């Protein structure tokens, strides 16, 4: 990747809906080379998806909670259940594996309210058995 690719990626990360003519103008190259670069970045897997970033407050989820999880049983059966639960619940936005702390995982969860989060947390605990 060169500096043009890096500029292109930074721009697309901010707004991938820009018309190709606007992208190429901002990057400083003509449209055909710009389109070719985007396609190459997609083919190489550097650009994986083009997504819409939602305003979670306007979507009805104004509360963000970070849940630390400490696991007592590190086996593949537990991890499979954990992975299935994470994928199933749309309120879980991110999952991070931690090292160097007492927690094993950190989950970023969105909710409609603290009460909604409390209900969700109890349901998650019952499902996964930490």
Where are these regions (language model features)?
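A compositional/biophysical signature of low hydrophobicity enriched in polar/charged and small residues
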Residues: 1-130
């Amino acid at each position: 990747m060169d500096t043009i690719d890096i500029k292109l990626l930074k721009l697309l990360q901010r707004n991938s809906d820009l018309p190709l003519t606007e992208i190429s103008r901002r990057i400083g190259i003509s449209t055909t080379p710009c389109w070719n670069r985007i396609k190459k970045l997609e083919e190489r897997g550097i650009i994986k998806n083009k997504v819409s970033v939602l305003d979670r407050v306007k979507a009805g989820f104004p509360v963000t909670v970070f849940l630390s999880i400490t696991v007592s049983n590190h086996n593949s059966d537990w991890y499979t259940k954990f992975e299935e639960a994470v994928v199933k619940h749309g309120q879980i936005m991110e999952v991070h594996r931690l090292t160097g702390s007492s927690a094993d995982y950190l989950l970023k969860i969105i909710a409609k309210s603290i009460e909604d989060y409390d209900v969700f947390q109890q349901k998650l605990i019952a499902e996964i058995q930490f």
